[in-house]
């Protein structure tokens, strides 16, 4: 996402997600979960357009400067794409920028938006996201398999999610949180 959104835009969208998790009309990350299963591979790329439509269309920018910065980045991105194609470097752009962006965005959307919140059936604090305990996933996803910890205590740094999960497991389980693969 770093190539397509500014930090203020991401911060705004992420804050809105935390304040309205799994609420279809507001949560910007719900779009991938609501898509038909056969379209999900395409919808894994939905942040490219849904974040913008909500950021611009619903006035989520915190300041005019934040909005202008995103507009400048969007214009620069489109201009760069057009320039690459016009100068015969479309294939280079595809191989060096577009394919890596699509693959990384699909993985990030799957790991951060879809899997942690599936089945999108609750807006309750302890039920709107889950933890998927796994040492391997902890390494590959930089702790986001413990996304439940991120939602409950968003000031905890990602590298402590697993530790906090272990320390709070009994309390989380008692509260009915989705703390295991089968929940």
Question: Model segments located where?
Answer:
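Short, surface-exposed loop/helix-turn segments at secondary-structure junctions
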Residues: 123-129
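Juxtamembrane C-terminal module of membrane proteins
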Residues: 124, 139-142, 159, 170
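Histidine-centered catalytic micro-motifs
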Residues: 10-23, 113-118, 140-156
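Short hydrophobic "helix-edge" motifs at membrane interfaces and signal-peptide entry regions
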Residues: 90, 106-108, 139-141
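Non-catalytic, topology-defining segments of multipass membrane proteins
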Residues: 1-99, 155-183
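Transmembrane alpha-helical segments that form the membrane-embedded catalytic/substrate-channel core
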Residues: 6-10, 99-123
């Amino acid at each position: 996402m770093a190539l397509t959104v500014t930090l203020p835009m991401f911060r705004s969208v992420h804050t809105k997600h935390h304040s309205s998790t799994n609420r279809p009309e507001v949560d910007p990350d719900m779009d991938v979960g609501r898509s038909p299963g056969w379209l999900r591979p395409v919808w894994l790329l939905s942040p490219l357009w849904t974040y913008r439509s909500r950021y611009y269309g619903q006035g989520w920018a915190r300041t005019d400067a934040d909005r202008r910065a995103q507009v400048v980045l969007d214009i620069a991105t489109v201009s760069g794409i057009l320039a690459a194609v016009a100068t015969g470097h479309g294939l280079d752009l595809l191989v060096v920028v577009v394919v890596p962006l699509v693959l990384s965005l699909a993985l990030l959307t799957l790991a951060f938006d879809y899997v942690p919140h599936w089945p999108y059936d609750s807006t309750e604090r302890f039920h709107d996201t889950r933890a998927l305990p796994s040492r391997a996933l902890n390494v590959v996803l930089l702790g986001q398999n413990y996304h439940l910890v991120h939602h409950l205590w968003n000031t905890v740094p990602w590298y402590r999610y697993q530790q906090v999960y272990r320390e709070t497991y009994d309390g989380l389980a008692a509260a009915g949180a989705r703390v295991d693969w089968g929940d």
